[in-house]
Amino acid sequence: MFRKLSSNSAWLIAFFACFAVYLSIACYPFVLSNNQNEPLTLLQGYYLVSTQYGWLGLIALPFMLLSLLLSFLPTRAFKGIVIAIAICLLIMFKVDILVFQQYKLHINALLIRMFFEGGGDVFDISWMSWLIFVSEVAVLVIGLVCTVWVSNKLAQSRAKFVLISVWFAVLLSTQMIHAYKNALYDDEVSQFSNNWPLYYPLTARKFIYKHDLVDENIASKNRVELTNIERSSLNYPLAPIQVQSKEKQPNVLFILVDAWRYSDATPEVMPNVSKFAEKTVNFTQHMSGGNSTQAGIFSLFYSLPATYWESFYASQRSPVFMDTLQAEGYRMGIFGSAPLTSPPLSRTVFKKVSDLTLKQTGETAVERDQQITDKFIEFQKQDSDKPYFGFLFYDAAHGTVFPELEFAKFKPYWERVDHILLNNDFDASLYHNRYKNSLYYIDSLIGDVLKNVDLDNTIVVISSDHGEEFNDHKMNYWGHTGNYSDVQVHVPLYVYMPNRQPEQINYRTTHFDVVPTMMNTLFDVQGTTSSYSVGHNLFDSSAPRDWYIAGSYYNYALVGKELMLVVNPGGHSQQLNRQLKVEKEQKVPVDIIRHSLDEMSRFYKKG
């Protein structure tokens, strides 16, 4: 028995060493999937080839390790099972390559669902396509036979350990290269991150800066200096945006409160904002493009689904809206309470903003919120013949902190937040009251801001990146990023425009709609909104908004008014109703899935 285990294990090690090499060759289209406008550098070439070898081998590794559990089987049976697993992996990678070449998306639950439920309505696969696919798989199997033959030769040789060592060293080197380049704000290699399925490369900026391996000040300068480098497979915008400023250029001020749930936008909790709201257009059914800061801010400024985040982050591509404001001479006043590096808004939304303050000096969110308020008030007082774009992002509600002597309005409240105590039986009102106290504090700061703003010449947008849940569904969801229910994605939106009458709008709107509205309000834009956005004008009541795409850090959802389809990594999806219960009676229409797929792939280069 021991001899059989030893023999099978030795062969499996040799097979994995050879199979990793074979996978990297068989899946060569992954390496070629970027539309590169410039010749590859030597480092880029090494990174592409080495990541192909290292990462695909790493994906195969768990399957090989699980096979060890069967090493007690007779040799032929054991090898047969391992080879069958390898064939399945090859087919999986082949299908993923075909999907990626078509949609610039790797296989996910949405595509699988479309295939089985949409059938020929979505995927038009001819018999010739099937024949070509089967033929290509047959060729891959022939190559696998050669791999098995080499493995048999190496099974009793120490060369297999050399190959394994080389594979591990190559994998490690690619991750170290990515971490180092990422710390430098250099997208030389990170732009290729979307090439491979399940690829999440290593980042270690805090460690690198802490140990002085890279000078953080120099790195932050690179963030601006790399502005004009164009290296990505994005096709954004779809056509050049040409604008002409209108006769009067108003200032624009975005005030965002992190984690502000719609139900707490009340006169009791937010008296200053509520009073100001009487002068605004109040969008009562406004939805964020995500349940996280990253997704919410991305959807607001880019007017695109958060599924594009990784590509924009890797290529450090700033949004059309910010580019246009800067090109038209707007001064930038960007004031974030939380660091603008987490999530990395400094490398995306505000990529081209010079002299950007990445982090405020305050120790607490209370101090930092006060700091950004004071800094903005000073900024907008500066004499200038040019308009400004202001961005204020308050953080106290996210951390549920506030000056307790002055702003403890809602009692009793949780005196110290200890997340480990949260469960279905916890009294949510204690936590919620603490949260409302922090909103009450933020409201006082927003009140100070609004007193100092020239409302005769300033457009003011007040909203949030996402909502906040306090176990509303009795399913132990607390905070955000947990689901796509209204309490986590429904946010306030108040838009103040000089000379526009206040009103309340009750149809659904989304974060995707804000930028198209601003662009057409501020400028005469040549071209269509769809060339840079999936949104519509906020004031267009006829625009289709029954479904929209909401994102998070790890999954996304197609959100309707009564139904949502949540798509998770690894091929699992769920249909839920608004109460987050599994919905089996209704189904998301195939045309909605098809349209959503187009929205998630439209801004990638084809071919």
Report each predicted region and the residues it spans.
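Transmembrane and membrane-interface helices of multi-pass
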Residues: 1-199
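Histidine-centered active-site microenvironments of extracellular/periplasmic hydrolases
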Residues: 454-499, 545
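Phosphate/oxyanion-binding loops and surfaces in catalytic or ligand/nucleic-acid-binding neighborhoods
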Residues: 56, 94, 98, 307, ...
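Membrane-interface soluble catalytic domains
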Residues: 6, 10-16, 71, 75, ...
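A short beta-strand-to-alpha-helix junction
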Residues: 312-317, 429-441, 483-489, 500-518, ...
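A long, amphipathic alpha-helix that forms part
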Residues: 198, 220-221, 374-381, 415-458
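Active-site-proximal alpha/beta segments of enzymes that process anionic O-linked groups
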Residues: 170-419, 535
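Generic structural signal for small/hydrophobic residues in well-ordered secondary structure
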Residues: 258, 300, 325, 392, ...
